[in-house]
């Protein structure tokens, strides 16, 4: 089988000698478990995104898990089993799995194929008396219209959560995506805006939730809690007693100290990474905004452009399979738009308590006719022009 050279990969490394030196510092210290570097990264992360608190975890998926879990453990629980959470029909699997794992009713709503985010008109009509939260997913770097979502929930006992794992650095009206909800999650996996090997973060302005996140991140013990906290009140002055005191059913989703050290360096570079992604996007939009048979994602606010969606129009002379073949033969990596329509995954949905709010026509459409190619923190002008020339033929 002929091996095709990759000319335009989905992602590329964001590291240089600064990250390698950070790793070496941790190796030299001989302290590999979560410590001062993680703590500093959390401080830097919260400051960068304008949030009071940040908790680093092992991945964006575990960030979602802790975000949902924490809402069951507040003094006045914000969730109970059976509560309804509205989600878009297009997202990554671990947006949904924590909802199932905690016995919540998942209510799927169609997306808008222009923005790839939840359809706002369908969201409004999807709300029921059981709805407790909207888990908004900012897809492929594109923030939701949170002004509209806030207006929809006005006067209702409904809070907003954000899965911002694909949209680090996106903004709406000058405010960072991930900070519009009660909590927001981020990913720093290799292919994302910054990379800490594996890694994720949860941010919040709520101190009680912050303390719960600290507790359930590491075994549900009190060891990492402040001396006075919202879970146990005043901790014992005896460190031996507090070292193995368990108060919540937690996990072990701690990050490595190495990941924290890398993250400190990566955050310094994030503004330039986002700037270059947006420069690439400007070229992409100029070339593809009037393409005869391809639609592109419509930007809301200031996208951080995780990747570039290519959605075939109904009048397209080629199928998606033919589009994929063209791209692969040209050495251009591509993949479906996240998972496509998640509702096609009947094998796993049999474990869910879920409802569907009407038709999911746009989710189905992008599932069959959409894909995306990568965007990077480096200049891709030649690759994007080449992509356009290939699809002009």
Swiss-Prot record:
* Localization annotation: Cell membrane
Q: Name one GO molecular function term.
A: transaminase activity
Which residues are noted in the entry as GDP-4-dehydro-alpha-D-rhamnose-binding? 30-33, 223, 333
- The membrane spanning regions, by residue number, are 53-73
State the annotated membrane topology for this chain: Single-pass membrane protein
Question: Could you tell me which InterPro entries the record lists for this protein?
Answer: DegT/StrS_aminotransferase, PyrdxlP-dep_Trfase, PyrdxlP-dep_Trfase_major, PyrdxlP-dep_Trfase_small
User: Which cofactors are reported in the record for this sequence?
Assistant: pyridoxal 5'-phosphate
- Tell me one Pfam family matched here: DegT_DnrJ_EryC1
Q: Which reaction does this chain catalyze? A: GDP-4-dehydro-alpha-D-rhamnose + L-glutamate = GDP-4-dehydro-3,6-dideoxy-alpha-D-mannose + 2-oxoglutarate + NH4(+)
Q: Which UniProt keywords apply?
A: Cell membrane, Lyase, Membrane, Pyridoxal phosphate, Transmembrane, Transmembrane helix
Q: Where does pyridoxal 5'-phosphate bind?
A: 60-61, 92, 166, 187, 252
Active site annotation, chain numbering: 192
Pathway-wise, it operates in: Nucleotide-sugar metabolism; GDP-L-colitose biosynthesis
What positions does the entry give for L-glutamate binding?
219, 254
| Gene Ontology CC | plasma membrane
| Known EC number | 4.2.1.168
An example Gene Ontology biological process: nucleotide-sugar metabolic process
* PANTHER family, per the entry: DTDP-4-AMINO-4,6-DIDEOXYGALACTOSE TRANSAMINASE, TRANSAMINASE
Sum up the protein's function in the record's words. Involved in the biosynthesis of L-colitose, a 3,6-dideoxyhexose present in the O-antigen region of lipopolysaccharides (LPS), where it serves as an antigenic determinant and is vital for bacterial defense and survival. Catalyzes the removal of the C3'-hydroxyl group from GDP-4-keto-6-deoxy-D-mannose via a combined transamination-deoxygenation reaction. The catalysis is initiated by a transamination step in which pyridoxal 5'-phosphate (PLP) is converted to pyridoxamine 5'-phosphate (PMP) in the presence of L-glutamate.
Q: How does it assemble?
A: Homodimer.
Entry's family note: Belongs to the DegT/DnrJ/EryC1 family.
| Entry protein name | GDP-4-keto-6-deoxy-D-mannose 3-dehydratase
User: In the UniProt record, what gene is named as encoding this protein?
Assistant: colD
